[in-house]
Amino acid sequence: MIKNICYITYQTFPASTANSLQTISNIKYFIKNKCDVSLIYPLREKSSSSSIEEIQDFYNTSIPININGVEHNYPFGKIKFFEGLMFHISHYLWAKKTVKKVEDSIYDFYITRSDWIFYFLLRKTNKRVIFECHKVSKLRKIILRFCLKKSNAKVIYLNKNLMNIFSKFNTEMNTIVLHNGVDLDDFKNSNNLNKNMDIIFIGNLQRFSKSRNIKFAIDGFVKSKLSNSFSLKIIGGPEDISNSLRDYVNENYENENIKILGQLGRIEAKNSLNKARVGVLINDNKDEHSYLHSSPLKYFEYLASNLKVVAPDFPAHKELPYSENIIFYNHDDLKSFSNALEQSLVEELKYIDLDKISLDYRIKKILEFIDK
C-alpha cells in the first residue's frame, strides 16, 4: 500500500547545505520504497524556488516530488541583524501558520526536523508525526519533553548520545537511533576506479557560521611525509572562505600540492571523492553538536568511495558505524594529525557492508519504525 507522506521543514530549497541534500536524498528513497511525498518549505531566501525543474536540476535528480514552496513574509533571511532572534520568531510564526493550512486528511504521516512544526502538528492531528533530531538546544529539550508524551509522536535520534539526553521520555515504541546514510547510486563503481594520490576534505568550510579550522588540516598535511607525493584537496564554500584559504596557502607555503577548489557541482565533487585515497573529518571540539552528536554525511560518502578516514577522537565519531576503520588523531595536535595521515596509507580497511549504511536501508528502517 502506498503511503502518503508530508515532509514539512523550515529548511529552504535549493540550497548547498548538507541538511538540504539529506532531505532530498531521503525523499528519493521514500519514493523508491513506494511512498508519495509532498515537500513543504519556506521561500525565505532570494535563491528559494518552488520550481520542480530548478530543484531537480540543482540536486541532479529526476525524483517526482510534490513541491510546495510557501510564502515567508517574516524577517529571517531579510534582516541581517539579530539573526538568531529573527530565526526563532520567524520559524515559530511560519510553522504555526503553515501547519494550520495543511490538509490533514490526505496524509498518512508527517516528517519534520523543525521543533515548532513538530509541536504544532501534534496539537492538530492524531496521525503519526516523526521528528528527526540531529542536535540539542534549550528549546528542543522543552519541546521534546512535552511532545514525547503524545502517543502519536516518534523521534529519530542521530546517535545514542542524543537519545540518552531524553532517556526519561523515550520508549522502544517512540524512539530509534539511526545514523545518516549515503546514496549508493552515486558511488556504484568506486572500488573499480584508479585512485589518485589525493587526500580530500569535502563539505561546508564553516559550521554554524564558525570556522571548521581547515587551516589546521593544511598545516598538518604540510608537516607530514605525504606533502611531496600526495595532494590535499579542499572542496567546499562559501566562496569568501575558500578565497581566504587560498591566500593563506599562498602566503605561508610554496606547495603546489595544496588545492583549494571551492564549491564544485555535485557530479564533479563525487568524481573527486571516488578518485581520492583518504578522507578527512575536521571540526571544533567547542561545538557540542560536532563533539557529541554529529553523524556527518561526508563520512558515509567517504566509506562509499572506499576511502581511508582520518578524524578527531570525538565521542560522536566513535559512535559512527564502522568507526573501527577510522584513524583517529588528537584534536588540535598537528603531529598527531600528520601521523594519522601517514598511518592511513598502511592501515587495511576492515569489512564494511555498504548496504547497511545506504539511504535505502535507512528509509526501510524508518518505515518499519513508523509502523510499530
Can you name each region flagged by the protein language model?
Residues F208-R212, I267-S272, G279-E301, A311-E319:
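Nucleotide-sugar-dependent
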Residues C6-I8, I156, N192-V222, L232-K233:
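Conserved donor-binding/catalytic core segment of Leloir-type glycosyltransferases
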Residues T9-S16, D36-I89, F118, G237-I241:
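N-terminal strand-loop element at the rim of the active site
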Residues G236, L245-L273:
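Nucleotide-activated donor-binding/catalytic signature segment of Leloir-type glycosyltransferases, i.e.
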Residues N19-F30, A217-G220, K298, I366:
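Short amphipathic alpha-helix
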